[in-house]
């Protein structure tokens, strides 16, 4: 029996328990392992046909298998959730978002529709600079309330973990405020957040023409304060022609690593700039965007532990060429896909749109895209040992679909087919009329 399809906009919790027995599953589909999957192996999912069951105890998966074989002692005190024949996949990991920001840039979107480029708008004082002004003027409460709207929508689409970056402050006070909002959000809603410091998103107006001085300001003043307050675990930078060069990137990321941060990089988005090679050399968790990655960059990532995080909704929004996902997978890269939610180049956190673009325009299979959005997304934030697959010992993060097979994620174009999102055993069911 098929579940009624949900409305994506309204989410209610139906079961709040860390001990949960999920029964009557039509099919379980998951990648397996504790690290990123490279190349064509991304398409090799572990499939369990139903009637299947999953047991979560104390928020951790304790059983995955046939419903008829569930040990009775495992489910004695469990809340029961009936999947009604729906497929179950791992909770989605959105490994690249700019979740916390002030203001909107709807007029810039109209300018791009009329032919203006993203970089021309940015160089004219729009783009990141306009969001920086609005974010600096926003209160903690305003930033938190705006982010909550996006998080509720993301939860309804199956996201259980997300990266959240700062980078719209670019001064000490506002960068700390953004990260404090992320910390508050972690305590006030279900999605687990991975906090990333991205003060090096651009050079702010007060450092205009002095980008190297700005990097030193981040290294000497901002990063140590972020570290001492425990507000972020990762450091990111926009390595791009006209933004930050390789020398500046090395300076910031090497300093961040010495302080105990993991590393990420926005790389090769606008022009081929050798960012992928540099990310692999520095041991970044991920190199993100990669619309203009070179052959050398593909080879470097394929021979490294750095995940290639692709952001198809951004290419779609910018009317840009998509990252060469098919070539990257065929040459052995570990690929993740993520939303890049932000107020400028991609005002969307739509999992259905992202999934369809990856399959239709980037040449990825339904299986590869599922791996990219789960286990490889988890690896891109350093959490593949804890989340990203449905295996005993991992966190109880699941998505119950309204259809009996995961392939409907790409087949039912543009539609949210998530019936329920399960986070650590707590069930959040989309509102159904």
Give the ranges of each region predicted by the language model:
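Metal-associated gating/positioning segment near the N- to mid-region
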Residues: 78-146
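Metal-coordinating catalytic core of metallo-dependent amide/deamination hydrolases
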Residues: 126-148, 152-153, 160-273
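Active-site-adjacent C-terminal substructures of enzyme catalytic domains
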Residues: 262, 272-389, 401-408, 413-415, ...
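Conserved beta-strand scaffold positions in the cores of enzyme catalytic domains, especially
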Residues: 21, 78-82, 195, 421
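Divalent metal-coordination and catalytic microenvironments
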Residues: 25, 54, 59, 85, ...
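Non-catalytic positions within long, well-ordered alpha-helices that form the structural scaffold/packing
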Residues: 155, 227-228, 257, 280, ...
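N-terminal metal-binding scaffold of metallo-dependent hydrolase/deaminase domains
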Residues: 10-72, 408
